[in-house]
From Swiss-Prot:
UniProt protein name: Large ribosomal subunit protein bL9
Top-rank taxon, per record: Bacteria
Molecular functions per Gene Ontology: rRNA binding; structural constituent of ribosome
A single GO BP: translation
Residues spanning the membrane: none
Entries under InterPro entries matching the protein: Ribosomal_bL9, Ribosomal_bL9/RNase_H1_N, Ribosomal_bL9_bac/chp, Ribosomal_bL9_C, Ribosomal_bL9_C_sf, Ribosomal_bL9_N, Ribosomal_bL9_N_sf
UniProt entry keywords in alphabetical sequence: Ribonucleoprotein, Ribosomal protein, RNA-binding, rRNA-binding
Family under the similarity heading: Belongs to the bacterial ribosomal protein bL9 family.
Pfam families found in the cross-reference section: Ribosomal_L9_C, Ribosomal_L9_N
Any GO CC annotation of this UniProt entry: ribosome
Keyword rRNA-binding listed: yes
Function: Binds to the 23S rRNA.
Record-linked PROSITE patterns: RIBOSOMAL_L9
Length: 150
């Protein structure tokens, strides 16, 4: 019996796959537990439509990420921070991914999720710093930060 998997089933198939499985296994286990449904011509058409819509959505997300990357990679896109600095040359407050995200929104109108900004630890130094941003699994940009003494 041909079935369309609605969820990943270890050793049998992944979500969205169409596979031939034993009839008893399909009826008594997969279909009963909503892990799969029978592959009729109508359900196959629905699946193809969903896959096309998903691909289109992924393409839009990728295009949006590339547009944001183009803005961030421009030389004039430099996020300005003014921080108080102690005698040892370190800032009193640290610059976190959240702060960087908020300043990008405020200064350039570019919305970047703070979870996409790759910081090993908060920035406490002054000067010019480049921070990588993972906008999409295929798109990575660099944010230029100019941290000056207040």
């Amino acid at each position: 019996m041909k079935v369309i998997f609605l969820a990943d089933v270890k050793g049998k198939g992944k979500k969205g796959e169409i596979k031939e499985v034993p009839t008893g296994y399909a009826q008594n286990f997969l279909i009963k537990k909503n892990l799969a449904k029978e592959a009729t011509s109508q359900s196959i058409g629905e699946l193809k439509g969903k896959q096309k819509a998903e691909e289109k959505a992924q393409a839009e997300i990728l295009a949006e990420a590339q547009a944001v990357k183009a803005v961030l990679d421009e030389d004039k896109t430099r996020v300005q921070f003014q921080e108080k600095v102690g005698p040892d040359g370190r800032t009193f407050g640290s610059i976190t991914a959240k702060k960087i995200s908020e300043e990008l929104q405020k200064q350039f109108g570019v919305k970047v999720d703070k979870r996409h900004i790759v910081l090993d630890h908060p920035i406490r130094a002054i000067g010019l710093i480049e921070v990588p941003v993972k906008l999409h699994k295929e798109v990575t940009a660099e944010i230029k930060l100019a941290i000056t003494e207040a």
